Swiss-Prot record:
It comes from Prochlorococcus marinus (strain MIT 9301). InterPro entries: Nict_dMeBzImd_PRibTrfase, Nict_dMeBzImd_PRibTrfase_arc, Nict_dMeBzImd_PRibTrfase_sf. This is UPF0284 protein P9301_04631. GO terms for molecular function: nicotinate-nucleotide-dimethylbenzimidazole phosphoribosyltransferase activity. Pfam families: DBI_PRT.
């Protein structure tokens, strides 16, 4: 991986330095004119014990995405409605995203899908909330194809209407598992490459869950991206496919802020496009993530696997943010491999660095917000919340 003077690491296709620097310039030029979407989605895959660190148990994972969205918008607040779930280690990456979005004066748009309740904060309504979470992928019937197509069409329409570059982020407990299922449905052997919010990825559990889902899906030879999402995917993937394609049709650059979940969306789009305009499509699409997620090189290998399969040149950028100097265990846990990414932490912190903010400034603000959220009782202390 190549590192710039800002400490930003590139991964994936690193064919020439000029292209890398052009990507940096695109980002820097658009920091103040960027539409940030946080897509919060529910899948009952998250209810499998041990599948996710986005909440200490299945019950707490039901409100994780809502709490993440609330914290992204409001930060530490006495009037908070949703408690952030207690984690085995670390703290929600929404902390990083909140701090950095405030630094760059960004106002994220929240898109709830399959959450089951109406958030009190401003949000974009794209489907009936009574639809609820998608089914567990083990059923092989995550959603109806009608729902998938509706989410795709809504995302497409929003994307095509955009007049500025886009950053797509997510909070989807269980979403890394549905991402892996989608990639394996298209023949990619990625079980050792897909990461996890957990310190140790539950690889064997995931293999069993995904194997069962793929068997129950009964795919046909002509099954397409929509069939795959309907079988083993989640609402985030369906909507983001449309949003990504729509934004590119509107000639807007797109930052996918995350890891394997964003790569699953890219794969779904590449399968859908086939050979049509894929090079033009991918040129101004790139992955942005945290340095913690690229530490072991698995994400780099995963990006290159997609590059090879689809003959594209997808490039990734990793934020230089680190918590080595922090005095708090919850932040230092990131350096040990806990949590790693989520809620757009990589992409939004990367933008803060490109806007001139220093690591120590971001760390200091994260510490202040952590102190406040703990003081206000914003993190649940219940292990069975």
């Amino acid at each position: 991986m190549y590192s710039t003077e800002l400490g930003i690491n590139f991964f994936g296709n690193e064919s020439n330095k000029k292209r890398q620097l052009n990507k940096i310039e695109i980002l820097k030029k658009n920091i103040k004119n960027l539409k940030i979407f946080l897509i919060i989605a529910g899948t009952n895959t998250s209810q499998i014990p041990g599948i996710s660190a986005a909440g200490i148990n299945p019950k707490s994972r039901r409100t994780t995405a809502l709490a993440d969205a609330e914290f992204l918008l409001e930060g530490a607040s006495k009037g908070h409605k949703y408690k952030l779930p207690l984690l085995n280690a670390g703290v929600t990456p929404a902390l990083i995203s909140h701090v950095c979005s405030k630094l760059i004066n960004a106002y994220p748009v929240i898109v709830p899908l399959g959450i089951g309740v109406k958030p009190y904060f401003n949000h974009l309504v794209v489907e009936d909330r009574n639809l609820g979470p998608s089914n567990c992928l083990t059923t092989g019937k995550s959603m109806t194809k009608e729902r998938v197509l509706n989410l795709y069409e809504k995302g497409l329409a929003i994307g095509k209407s955009l007049k500025q570059p886009v950053l797509i982020s997510e909070s989807v407990p269980g979403g890394t598992t549905t991402a892996q299922a989608v990639m394996e449905a298209f023949g990619l052997q990625v079980s050792n490459l897909v990461g996890s919010s957990l310190f140790k990825a539950p690889r064997e559990l995931r293999r069993q869950v995904i194997k069962r889902g793929l068997l129950n899906a009964h795919f046909k030879a002509d099954s397409d991206s929509f069939d795959v999402v309907a079988a083993v995917g989640d609402p985030f993937q369906a909507f983001s496919m449309g949003l990504l394609i729509g934004a590119r049709l509107a000639k807007q650059p797109v930052i996918l802020s995350g890891g394997s979940q964003m790569l699953a969306v890219i794969l779904l789009v590449l399968e859908f496009l086939g050979e049509k305009n894929k090079d033009e499509f991918i040129e101004d699409v790139f992955i942005a993530t945290t340095g913690w997620l690229v530490k072991d090189n698995s994400l780099n290998d995963l990006v290159n696997l997609i590059n090879e399969k689809y003959d594209v040149k997808l490039l990734g950028l990793a934020s230089p943010l680190n918590f080595k100097s922090s005095k708090y265990k919850e932040l230092k846990d990131y350096e040990l491999g806990h949590v790693k990414e989520g809620v757009g932490a990589g992409g939004i912190s990367l933008l803060a660095f490109l806007d001139g903010f220093k690591n120590e400034e971001i760390v200091s603000l994260c510490q202040q917000n952590l102190e406040m959220m703990k003081g206000l009782g914003q993190i649940s202390l219940e292990k069975d919340c």
